[in-house]
UniProtKB/Swiss-Prot annotation:
Stated name of the protein: Dihydropyrimidinase 2
Highest classification ranks of the organism: Eukaryota, Metazoa, Ecdysozoa, Nematoda, Chromadorea
NCBIfam families documented for this protein: D-hydantoinase
N6-carboxylysine modified-residue sites: K152
Tissue: Body wall muscles.
Residues that bind Zn(2+) 2: K152, H185, H241
An individual GO BP term: nucleobase catabolic process
GO function term, MF aspect, one: hydrolase activity, acting on carbon-nitrogen (but not peptide) bonds, in cyclic amides
InterPro entries hit by this protein: Amidohydro-rel, Hydantoinase/dihydroPyrase, Metal-dep_hydrolase_composite, Metal_Hydrolase, Metallo-dep_Hydrolases_sf
Source species: Caenorhabditis elegans
Amino acid sequence: MSLLIKNGTIVNDDAIFKSDVLVLDGRIVEIAPSIQPTPGLEVVDATDRLVIPGGIDPHTHMQLPFMGEIAKDDFHRGTEAAVAGGTTMIIDFVIPTKGESLLVAYDRWRGWADPKVVCDYGLSMAITSWGPEIAKEMEIVTGAEYGINSFKFFLAYAGVFMVRDEEFYQGMIQCAKLRALARVHAENGSVIAERCEHLLSSGITGPEGHTQSRPEELEAEATFRACTMASQANCPLYVVHVMSKGAAAAIAHHRKKGAVVFGEPIAAGLATDGSHYYNEDWLHAARYVMSPPLSRDPSTPSALMKLLAAGELHLTATDNCTFDCQQKSLGKDDFTKIPNGVNGVEDRMSVVWDKGVHAGIIDPMRFVAVTSTMAAKIFNCYPQKGRIAVGSDADIVIWNANATRTISKDTHHHAIDFNIFEGMQVHGVPEITISRGRTVWANGQLKTVQGSGQFIPLAPDSQIVFSAVDNRKKAMEPVKIDRIPYEPSALQTPDANANIVVKAPVRAAIPPGGASSIQF
């Protein structure tokens, strides 16, 4: 595929400049102020448009089996929605059932994804059980044959995915040994289970019970706990779906102490809030059920965006895990049975541009960083991904910063019958999406080929993640004090009170602090 992009303004995470871009065989081969077209080249006119790296969504759950259902967006529909929104790579999660081999689960996910994806993808691995065999398989899947460089631990979903603190800690020690990133879903699953039982017994069965069972304090507590444990294990930590100010504050606290912690807010948390859970329409409220829940504080979305601007949160994702209205209705009499998950992979880029750049909170370079480049660096596929540069994959979006669109279930490409951003007008529109040199979205139309995406192996030991770990390890080495051997004499049994000097009481003429003026 030969392609020439003319007259555009390139935006990377560290620079903005006008230039043309030449693409051959799926890679960028030249960037220059004026490249002359040759016969056979497809020419794209990007006048008054931005030329940006394709988005990377580092947190999706396509066709995930969960809560007795299967997420509606499979790897075909989900990646079609992604490219329609300007995202050219996703990182999905292999989630084994309790006790299942990581290798067996990995093969199942690859079998689902490879024939369906229309853009590139990578995989992260969830750890839902612990033991010597799991630790051994973690080492295997971080090899080049499997291409896994991160492991996710759930501190929620008791009895399903949740691991105990000691398992989480041991897992992070193994991650650090393998130079793999630990990722965490931070909620207090034990307390949540108790609260759910209490609320249901109190007659609260609707979606409002979901948010009441998972107050923000439980996300903040679990985030702080996870960061503390990761620091003790000397393991870099990535906190997925940061939904509250308290969780973000916990991350900032530990980073200020030198911990290597990354925070990921998601599109839903940047654009909506938890007021929806109290809507009188049960189905409307149920559509927004996800975990952790959306914040009930209406100022949280703006606060999270400002933390992205300040560098206290680091990249954006979606946790795209879609269930339609019929599936959501399975919990009509019990909020704990509402399948958790929302959409986002199609709308993330526009939502972040609208709430960030258009709102004057971040600049276009920071937009590229939090939607693409930072993910590429953290997951060790930079500069292959996440940059407009010679030698990089031609994952490119022609972005119209001045255009607007209204988000709607009637026009989106998800496999569900609602959209949590319904009716929201957003500034910033991907006009053309290019995946490894192939135009997959143009003029509002998909041009995809099922199975044309590639699996991207992700190698461990990302330098942005692990460059400080070795020095931290040296600083954390245990300190031993060399002492003269202590050998108490067995022949001496001194009286415990023998050396105690007892003084006779003496009345102070003027006690310390001065004499009292109180008269009795």
